[in-house]
Amino acid sequence: MVVLAAAICTKNGKALLSRQFSEMTKSRVEGLLAAFPKLIGLGRQHTFIETENIRYVYQPLESLYIVLITNKNSNILEDLETLHLLAKLVPEYSNFDEYDISKNAFELIFTFDEVIAMGYKERVTLQQIKHFISMESHEEERFRMEEKIKQKEAQILASSKAKEIERMRHEEMLRGKRSGGYTGISGGGGMGSGGMGSNQYRDNDRDNYHSNNNNNNNNNNNNNNNNNNNRDRDRGDSPNTSRPSAASSGSQGGMILGGKSGTNKNSAIAQVLKEEKIVEKVEDVEQLLDSQISQIPETPTVPQEGVHITVEESFTSFVESDGTVESIDIKGGLSVQINDQSLGKVKVNLKQGKLSKQFQFITHPNIDKALFGEQSVLRLRDGGKGFPSGGILKWRCKTNQESMMPIRVNCWPSPGRDSTTVNLEYDSLVGYELKSVFIVIPNPTSNAPIINQFDGLYEYDNKQKCVIWKIPLIDDSNRQGSMEFSVKGNTQSFFPVKIQFTASQTICDTTVGSVFVEDSNQSTNFSTETTLSVDTYEIK
């Protein structure tokens, strides 16, 4: 006998799980595990401890320990190999907390039995053990497939039955409409004996029809007159008609002109979301939709002057889950569009802030590079005919400095007893406005999360299985914000977190100061359109 027991315990020595491979009492196992933490010295780098009779081979698992209790004659290298295999298997079936270990105790014991038999390590791999534990059966799989086929056939049959019922109902409605002009008017019995299609006319024999044709025509005329009078009387006197009035039918299914179509649309969307079980109350989602419409800022249209300058910049960043900035890549460009050809050649004076010194600038070959380097002025070289259409200035900065980020987002999943609480917070690091900020967090389960607290707006995408935190506008009134929700899941399953935003100012802090006509050296009116957008911003 080599391995006496395999166990998982806390750092205080509390036994959470133990599988004995020799005759050992419960009190002895608990005593050995309780003494184990006291034997670990501070700052020790070893993974085993020897006493007079036994050896502890252990490995930390976050706040827990996985321990092999062996005799002193065992092969330490083989024991370490066994320990490492068990350490790889535990996270496949449980999280590293007391509640999950106790909840999945039987699955973990089964894995221990697959690795160790009679105290000796089995020659198995990780994939083989996972296959054994899954206990797949060909008969069971075939039974499941047959059940799925039966369910599909039942769904098809139910669908065909529903279509048949709908078709029959439609035919009955059509037949009712055809006969409604004769039978539907009598309702409360107001037709009388002189109504349309009198008993006298119906009692005549078909053989006598031609001989009595003239008399019948006269009778029909009288009957028609009586019918019209009776119809008018029924409309005025009979309150219980079988056919609803035009006003009531219009109010039920007709289109109301001049109504609030936006409110009706929101109500319809809210009803669909409630039926899909995305929200609990229709009123909540209607209020959310109304607030979204009112709070999302509109993008204004910039009127173009004779000289129109477009500045575009894209932001890319990857951040580790602990907040360490892995990389930041900022790319930008400036283009000039001459709408008034009578201006001729122009030169553009730029204003560059402090952050622009960290960027590398590249000018178009047709631009005077020396003048730009000395005075930050963009003008054509001698002999140039016009500004290139594809842009005249580009810049780029690759860094890992957090100060170059317009907004910083932190995600803190904290595992609990029944669920994981996810805390999110954002912090705007710039003084200008950020618009349409979207923070998307994946949901590892099919259950909708419980939102405990949030700033701004939020939405749960049931199909994509993600929580979307929305902040329509970040300015001086809300430079910081937070959100908290709870849902079951492993801490790493809430990543990557993706962030999107836009702004009307660049990180490079390069703006247009003035535009001059070269021939007259007179300033001219110009318009600018500046956009900062996110290419990729992820917390991994």
From Swiss-Prot:
InterPro entries: AP2_Mu_C_sf (IPR036168), AP_mu_sigma_su (IPR022775), Coatomer_dsu (IPR027059), Longin-like_dom_sf (IPR011012), MHD (IPR028565). GO terms for cellular component: COPI vesicle coat; Golgi membrane; phagocytic vesicle. Residues 212-229 have a biased composition (Low complexity). Transmembrane segments: none annotated. Residues 238-250 have a biased composition (Polar residues). Residues 179-197, 251-261 have a biased composition (Gly residues). It is a peripheral membrane protein. It is found in: Cytoplasm; Golgi apparatus membrane; Cytoplasmic vesicle, COPI-coated vesicle membrane. Keywords: Cytoplasm, Cytoplasmic vesicle, ER-Golgi transport, Golgi apparatus, Membrane, Protein transport, Transport. One of its GO terms (biological process) is protein transport. Residues 169-263 are annotated as: Disordered. It holds the Pfam family Clat_adaptor_s. Residues 304-540 form the MHD domain. The coatomer is a cytosolic protein complex that binds to dilysine motifs and reversibly associates with Golgi non-clathrin-coated vesicles, which further mediate biosynthetic protein transport from the ER, via the Golgi up to the trans Golgi network. Coatomer complex is required for budding from Golgi membranes, and is essential for the retrograde Golgi-to-ER transport of dilysine-tagged proteins. Oligomeric complex that consists of at least the alpha, beta, beta', gamma, delta, epsilon and zeta subunits. Belongs to the adaptor complexes medium subunit family. Delta-COP subfamily. PANTHER family: COATOMER SUBUNIT DELTA (PTHR10121:SF0). This is Coatomer subunit delta. It comes from Dictyostelium discoideum.
